[in-house]
Amino acid sequence: MIINARSFGEIEIEKEDIITFPDGIPGFEGLKQYIIINNPDEENPFQWLQSVDNGDLAFVIINPFLIKPDYDIVIPQSAIDKLKIEDKKDVFLYALVVVPKKLEDMTVNLSAPIVINGKEKLGRQI
């Protein structure tokens, strides 16, 4: 499957790599399918959560433990149920990065992480 992403041009993705956000992401509730695009520079910790439905929408994300090694979050039982999480090894956490015009003003949202069940390919911002 090929999608046209504004920041990346045409990229080929596999259907099995698509992560479904059943409720969308707050502010983008109508967009439910995303893929994670890894940074080609392995030294760069940023990745992208690219909408499959809208090529113009991609969120910069980062592993929150790279920012705050003692990061601790409790995933509500309702999210565990909706994401069909059965084993914590299937859970991946990401934080949204806010990238303003002045890069030195960049912030990371540790209060509302993205939780992904890698086994079921389901995601949710909590």
Segments predicted by a language model, with ranges:
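Long, compositionally biased stretches
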Residues: 2-68, 88-126
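Extended catalytic/binding region for NAD+/ADP-ribose chemistry, centered on the ART fold
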Residues: 70-75
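Short active-site loop/helix that positions an aromatic residue
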Residues: 77-87
